[in-house]
């Protein structure tokens, strides 16, 4: 997990240190104060990649740097310091393997999702692997292609595959639906069905009350 993030001369303030709590952290403030910027930097500290544009300090900033501490599954958590290199506008860090924080998921301000999986996104011997997977909102449902290769089938296809194959992932999905449901109106997975004329695949459905509702047509709140 990310334990600390210490910023110097990169935009939010001349000197800003955040000590993160072990589980839930709330960041509040008016528009334009840098809440999303802080989350972008937290993502970078955990994954050493950027979910969008890299953080660029103001031209007048002297010696901008980022210092952070990430606690992995094993080993001592040591501070990592990156000093901005203006010649190529990068934040260099040591080439050694970063700590293993586990899978990192970032729900971005634009409605998309970024996912970093150390088992799939970090291999020094295979630099051609994607640095991370960045999903637009529709790609979470419909799937993601990277460099002409299908890397994710999307939740709709996975849902039907898990359900028809009676796979353990479907049990986890059912439990997630149960936990997220209103007490008086539980959400349950319904039978897959064809939705659009001429479509060659089934889509997942939800049982909401006495009705079967295709997930693709469910309300935005659901």
What is the predicted function of each stretch?
Residues 42, 221-222:
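Short amphipathic C-terminal alpha-helix that caps PH/PH-like domains
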Residues 1-148, 161-171, 179-182:
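P-loop NTPase switch/coupling surface
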